[in-house]
């Protein structure tokens, strides 16, 4: 399954994230840090386990977030298309 992440403000939907059955996950760009990580995992689990209840998804996403966060997993911006001060990439 291919999953595509789209960042979109979700205030009207009153949600941090939304998973659609076509493999698209919408995440609110205002999410940061651990909460962003939790919601990304949560929405991915909806796509991977579509028959799971919301409560089961919540429990799994919280557990995975806590385990991976405690192991040091973080979001890192690794884009390198902006040259450094000396002009190198």
What are these regions (language model features)?
Residues 38-47:
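Active-site recognition of the HExxH zinc-binding catalytic motif
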């Amino acid at each position: 399954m291919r999953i595509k992440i789209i960042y979109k403000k979700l205030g009207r939907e009153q949600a941090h994230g939304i998973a659609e059955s076509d493999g698209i996950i919408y995440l609110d760009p205002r999410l940061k840090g651990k909460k962003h990580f939790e919601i990304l995992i949560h929405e991915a689990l909806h796509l991977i386990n579509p028959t799971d209840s919301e409560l089961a998804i919540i429990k799994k996403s919280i557990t995975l977030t806590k385990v991976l966060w405690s192991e040091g997993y973080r979001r890192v911006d690794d884009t390198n298309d902006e040259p450094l001060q000396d002009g190198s990439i």
